């Protein structure tokens, strides 16, 4: 159900006049910077494209602060398949890289084209959508759309707090996706947010 969307920055964060790209349908969220990596200006980058490295294929992106962000180098980071180490044009030291922390990156929607089928969605479009049940009760928020080899999953952060849960992104579990309303309707198993059971080794 998922389709992969195959000037120096001033990383001081958004100003009072910064655009609200999160609510602008002309832009699609592709990733978010994390903490600085090392001393040479590298920074961790969480990619929301199905192929994480594809985030580097769109040319300069637009930061949530409205400024152009040019990724000059990318490589996989250890620990998570969607985490990268990035170099950014104009960022050469740790302090400048650290100033990028939590800066969201967007691309204009026309750069992505359009999904071919009605049940295909850009993974980046799903990030941040509200998750509700058939009665309309808010259950959580989509934080990621990982795929570990067995099919697309929705990583859902529960509304009441606690550990995120993974739900297969199939029509059986996700009967409705409403991008315009910014919500998905799910038919979850009863134990979706249940704490993980301890392994036999933990009980010894």
Curated annotation (Swiss-Prot):
Originating organism: Methylobacterium nodulans (strain LMG 21967 / CNCM I-2342 / ORS 2060)
Name by which UniProt lists this protein: Ribosome maturation factor RimM
Record note on domains: The PRC barrel domain binds ribosomal protein uS19.
Keywords: Chaperone, Cytoplasm, Ribosome biogenesis, rRNA processing
PANTHER family assigned: RIBOSOME MATURATION FACTOR RIMM (PTHR33692:SF1)
Subunit structure: Binds ribosomal protein uS19.
Domain PRC barrel residue range list: 117-192
GO process annotations (BP): ribosomal small subunit biogenesis; rRNA processing
SUPFAM superfamilies for the chain: PRC-barrel domain, Translation proteins
Function of the molecule: An accessory protein needed during the final step in the assembly of 30S ribosomal subunit, possibly for assembly of the head region. Essential for efficient processing of 16S rRNA. May be needed both before and after RbfA during the maturation of 16S rRNA. It has affinity for free ribosomal 30S subunits but not for 70S ribosomes.
Family of the protein in this entry: Belongs to the RimM family.
Cysteines joined through disulfide linkages: none
GO CC term, one of those recorded: cytoplasm
Molecular-function annotations in GO: ribosome binding
Subcellular location: Cytoplasm
């Amino acid at each position: 159900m998922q389709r992969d969307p195959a000037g120096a920055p001033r990383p001081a964060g958004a100003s009072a006049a910064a655009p609200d790209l999160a609510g602008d349908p002309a832009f699609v969220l592709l990733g978010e910077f994390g903490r600085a990596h090392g001393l040479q200006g590298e920074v961790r980058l969480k990619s929301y494209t199905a192929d994480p490295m594809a985030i580097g294929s769109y040319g300069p992106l637009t930061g949530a602060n409205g400024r152009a962000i040019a990724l000059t180098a990318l490589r996989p980071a250890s620990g998570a398949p969607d985490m990268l180490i990035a170099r950014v044009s104009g960022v050469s030291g740790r302090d400048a890289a650290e100033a990028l922390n939590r800066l969201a990156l967007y691309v204009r929607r026309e750069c992505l084209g359009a999904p071919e089928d009605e049940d295909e969605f850009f993974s980046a479009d799903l990030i941040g959508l509200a998750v509700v049940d058939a009665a309309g009760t808010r259950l959580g928020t989509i934080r990621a759309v990982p795929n570990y080899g067995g099919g697309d999953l929705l990583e859902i952060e529960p509304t009441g707090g606690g550990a995120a849960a993974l739900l297969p992104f199939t029509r059986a579990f996700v009967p409705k996706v409403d991008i315009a309303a910014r919500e998905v309707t799910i038919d979850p198993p009863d134990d979706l947010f249940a704490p993980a059971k301890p392994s036999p080794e933990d009980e010894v």
